[in-house]
Amino acid sequence: MRGLLYLALAIVSEVFGSTMLKLSEGFTQAWPIAGVIVGFLSAFTFLSFSLKTIDLSSAYATWSGVGTALTAIVGFLLFGETISLKGVFGLTLVIAGVVVLNQSKAHAEDKKQTACE
């Protein structure tokens, strides 16, 4: 359970860092630059903590997939960026891929545990 908390914090930190990257205007604004550094440093720190209990493939796929989707939503909501129907479809596929990967890992773990009993 702690691994999932760290993974969620890694995702939020990465989205924060990406948002600050946009606000830094090409690394010309001091406070957003500090936000980029804090955001990405926190993201990788929390991701590394999550890897103590979550498989690398699941953690990284979830981090990158959910982070990508949330960053697109932040871009839409905060910066007025557009998301085309194809873009929505692509983000849906990314999220579906993360879900399928995590379900297959859970299924494999269940089989492994049943075999040991």
Curated annotation (Swiss-Prot):
Membrane-protein topology: Multi-pass membrane protein
InterPro entries found in the cross-reference section: Small_drug/metabolite_transptr, Small_multidrug_res
The entry's keywords: Cell membrane, Membrane, Transmembrane, Transmembrane helix, Transport
Main location: membrane
GO cellular component: plasma membrane
Taxonomic superkingdom: Bacteria
GO molecular function: transmembrane transporter activity
Alphabetized Pfam families for the sequence: Multi_Drug_Res
Subcellular location: Cell membrane
An annotated GO BP: transmembrane transport
Transmembrane annotation, as ranges: 3-23, 31-51, 59-79, 81-101
Primary role: Part of a multidrug efflux pump. Confers resistance to cationic lipophilic dyes such as ethidium bromide, acriflavine, pyronine Y and safranin O. The efflux is probably coupled to an influx of protons.
Subunit and interaction comment: The efflux pump is composed of EbrA and EbrB.
Family: Belongs to the drug/metabolite transporter (DMT) superfamily. Small multidrug resistance (SMR) (TC 2.A.7.1) family. EbrA/EbrB subfamily.
PANTHER family: MULTIDRUG TRANSPORTER EMRE (PTHR30561:SF1), SMR FAMILY PROTON-DEPENDENT DRUG EFFLUX TRANSPORTER SUGE (PTHR30561)
Protein name: Multidrug resistance protein EbrB
Lineage: Bacteria, Bacillati, Bacillota, Bacilli, Bacillales
